[in-house]
Amino acid sequence: MASPELAGLYQQVILDHSKLRKGSGLVDGGVAESHQLNPTCGDEITLRLHLVDGTGTGAGASDSTGGSTGEPIIERLSWDGQGCSISMASASLLSELAPGLTPTELTERIALFREMMRSRGAGVEDDEPLGDAAVLESVSKYIARVKCAMLAWVAAEDTVQQVTAGRA
């Protein structure tokens, strides 16, 4: 459990991201797009996945031998949305985390984030791969707000599935 000082810092990070909205503003040229709506509260987001060729030396683009996997690299997630501070902060934190990852690595982060959101405040063993998005762990205590935090992550998961299925 976080100390009161740490909890205050986490809350400030969430508020800052809900105002700054990193990655906000849809950018043309994405390879996949997903629109998600939380009918319970009206939060909504449209998210675009932007990839670049994975033959370079981007973060995470190497296999166990140090060679390139050839998997594309996420250049950015661009998004537009409206909703509560939690959903907007979560989208901002996700768009900060994703660049440099492969779609496979993003899928792993989404699964870890989902596990954290289902933990009801218990967290996950290792939240380091989530970067600053780990501050949203406190939201998992409030079941009604988990959908708010998950909205952008579900949209990102959908875009990765579109690319993987060859629909993009």
Residue ranges with predicted function:
Residues 41, 84, 148:
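Functionally engaged cysteine thiol sites
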Residues 1-12, 47, 72, 76-77, ...:
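Basic/polar, acidic-poor N-terminal "presequence/leader" segments
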Residues 20-55, 74-81:
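Structured beta-strand/loop patches that form or line metal/cofactor-binding pockets in enzymes
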Residues 90-102:
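Alpha-helical support elements that line or immediately flank enzyme active sites
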Residues 69-78, 127-131:
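Glycine-rich, flexible loop segments associated with nucleotide phosphate handling
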Residues 52-73:
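Intrinsically disordered, low-complexity terminal tails and inter-domain linkers enriched
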Residues 2-19, 23, 101-168:
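C-terminal binding/interaction regions
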Residues 82-88:
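Short, thiol/selenol-centered motifs that function as redox-active sites or metal-ligating centers
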